[in-house]
């Protein structure tokens, strides 16, 4: 029987890039991989309330000292920064002590967390841990993702659903999610929810569009980052009011006065 592979790994090197980038000798690679795992574990634990969606680590050797540049994508940058960037500075100092290298931490805001698979899976897991209905949690996540500009979404929850004695899987799907098309930008993530009846597994697939030759993965997600307007449509500023047609308003006022005078007579 054919099994479903991880869409992120299947598209790695085709339309997706690596989240860890380094130039090192072959003998140093195992230690750097272990160090990257420690960095990711530290950031996920300390910034869990900020909604971490992605961590990119890039290593550059500057003169005699090695520099580690980290891009932390979060949905709540205010929590990640803290008052006067106190939380960020504390994290940088701890990472420098952990790695014994210079660390640069860049916090980037995720503008549309409703269509990021990692954050959607985490949101469903939190609702299930708070005893919410697994059907309602999935349907609400699908509605928010489609409203934010996703072209397709699929969710799946597995385990003792509703406290049943026998475990089963139940999921929902809306739109297109082409898993066999390699140029299709499919975002995939998993999460776990710890409930009184055991652990529930959550899987989320979100389709953003096709990445054509000469484009990057950002081009499929960029048109909807600023809002729900269509491709190529400009958003009107809040203070920019539509121009009033004075002649039309005068005609409406004249007709209103005419009917009022006619009723009086």
From Swiss-Prot:
Which GO cellular component terms are attached? cytosolic small ribosomal subunit
| Origin superkingdom | Bacteria
Identify the Pfam families for this entry. Answer: KH_2, Ribosomal_S3_C
Region Disordered: which residues? Answer: 224-250
Q: Which residues form the KH type-2 domain?
A: 39-111
UniProt lists compositionally biased (Basic and acidic residues) regions at 238-250
Sorted UniProt keywords: Ribonucleoprotein, Ribosomal protein, RNA-binding, rRNA-binding
| NCBIfam families, per the entry | rpsC_bact (TIGR01009)
**Subunit structure as annotated in this protein's UniProt entry:** Part of the 30S ribosomal subunit. Forms a tight complex with proteins S10 and S14.
So what family is this one in? Belongs to the universal ribosomal protein uS3 family.
Protein name, UniProt field: Small ribosomal subunit protein uS3
Species of provenance: Acholeplasma laidlawii
Gene, per the UniProt record: rpsC
């Amino acid at each position: 029987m054919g099994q479903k592979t991880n869409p992120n790994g299947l598209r790695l090197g085709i339309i997706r890039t690596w989240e860890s980038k380094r130039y090192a000798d072959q003998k140093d690679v195992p230690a750097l991989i272990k160090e990257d795992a420690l960095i990711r574990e530290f950031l996920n634990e300390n910034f869990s309330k900020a909604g971490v969606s992605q961590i990119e680590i890039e290593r550059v050797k500057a003169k005699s000292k090695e520099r580690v540049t980290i891009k932390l994508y979060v949905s709540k940058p205010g929590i990640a920064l803290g008052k006067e960037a106190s939380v960020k500075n504390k994290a940088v100092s701890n990472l420098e002590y952990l790695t014994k290298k210079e660390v640069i931490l860049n916090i980037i805001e995720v503008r549309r967390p409703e269509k990021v698979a990692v954050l959607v899976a985490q949101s469903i897991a939190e609702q299930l841990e708070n005893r919410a209905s697994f059907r309602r949690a999935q349907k609400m996540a699908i509605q928010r993702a489609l409203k934010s500009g996703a072209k397709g979404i699929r969710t799946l929850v597995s385990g003792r659903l509703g406290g049943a004695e026998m475990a089963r899987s139940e999921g929902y799907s809306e739109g297109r999610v082409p898993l066999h098309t390699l140029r299709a930008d499919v975002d995939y993530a998993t999460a776990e929810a710890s409930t009184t009846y055991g652990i529930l597994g959550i899987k989320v697939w979100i389709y953003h569009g096709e990445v054509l030759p000469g484009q990057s993965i950002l081009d499929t997600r960029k048109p909807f980052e600023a809002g729900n307007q269509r491709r190529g449509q400009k958003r009107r500023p809040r203070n920019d009011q539509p121009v009033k047609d004075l002649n039309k308003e005068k005609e409406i006022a004249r007709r209103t006065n005419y009917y009022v005078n006619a009723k009086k007579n």
